[in-house]
C-alpha cells in the first residue's frame, strides 16, 4: 500500500475502513515476522541457487526526546556516532541473482555507555590510611550485556528460519568478536568477514 505523508496510525486510518484505535490495538500484539518472511522466501528462492546469510546494522535518525531505544549509534554515512535508533538486519542473499531478502529486523536496545573512572583528588601522602585507601574499580563501569550480545542473540533467534542450504554467514569486521564468533560456531555456521585490526588468530579455533 502506498500512502502520502507520514506512515503512522492516524494516516493509515484515512486509507482504510479501520480506525486509528484498531491499528494501535493490533500493533500491541506480537507477530512472528521471521516466520512470515520465511514463507515468502520459500516461494521466491530458487532451490538450485546458492544462498548465504548476511547480518548488518542500519542507523535511523530520530529527533524525539522520549523515543524508546534512542541512544548514540555509529552512522556509517556520517562516519561517526550520532544520536538516533539502530536496527539489526539479517537477510538471505541469493548469489546468482544478487538479490537480498530481509528475514528478520530487530531494534538494538539502548545500553548504558561505559564512562571513564573518575580521578581521585590528589592529597598528601600522610592523609591516606591503609584502611581508607581504595583503588578505583575499572571493571565496575563496564556493562554486563553489550550490543554484541544483542546481535548474537538476534542471530540465535533467527537461525531456525534460515533455509536449510545456508552454511555461511557474512558480516563486517565489527562482528568479529569472541562473543559473536562463539554464537556462530554454536549455530553450526561458517563465518566470513574481515578481521579486526587488533585480532589475534589462533589455531585452536580451527581444531
Question: Across the structure, where does each feature detected by a protein language model lie?
Answer:
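Phosphate-ester processing/binding pockets and catalytic centers
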Residues: 3-5, 9-15, 21, 29-32, ...
Amino acid at each position: 500500500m502506498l500512502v502520502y505523508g507520514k506512515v503512522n496510525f492516524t494516516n493509515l486510518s484515512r486509507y482504510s475502513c479501520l480506525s486509528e484505535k484498531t491499528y494501535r490495538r493490533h500493533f500491541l500484539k506480537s507477530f512472528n515476522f521471521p516466520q512470515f518472511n520465511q514463507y515468502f522466501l520459500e516461494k521466491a528462492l530458487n532451490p538450485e541457487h546458492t544462498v548465504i546469510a548476511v547480518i548488518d546494522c542500519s542507523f535511523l535518525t530520530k529527533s524525539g526526546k522520549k523515543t524508546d531505544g534512542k541512544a548514540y549509534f555509529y552512522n556509517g554515512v556520517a562516519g561517526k556516532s550520532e544520536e538516533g535508533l539502530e536496527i539489526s538486519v539479517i537477510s538471505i542473499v541469493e548469489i546468482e541473482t544478487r538479490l537480498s531478502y530481509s528475514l528478520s529486523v530487530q531494534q538494538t536496545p539502548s545500553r548504558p555507555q561505559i564512562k571513564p573512572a573518575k580521578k581521585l583528588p590528589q592529597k598528601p601522602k600522610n592523609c591516606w590510611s591503609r584502611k581508607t585507601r581504595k583503588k578505583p574499580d575499572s571493571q565496575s563501569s563496564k556493562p554486563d550485556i553489550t550490543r554484541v550480545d544483542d546481535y548474537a542473540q538476534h542471530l540465535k533467534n533467527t537461525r531456525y528460519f534460515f533455509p536449510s542450504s545456508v552454511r555461511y554467514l557474512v558480516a563486517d569486521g565489527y562482528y568479529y568478536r569472541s562473543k559473536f564468533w562463539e554464537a556462530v560456531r554454536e549455530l553450526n555456521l561458517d563465518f566470513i568477514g574481515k578481521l579486526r585490526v587488533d585480532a589475534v588468530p589462533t589455531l585452536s579455533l580451527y581444531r
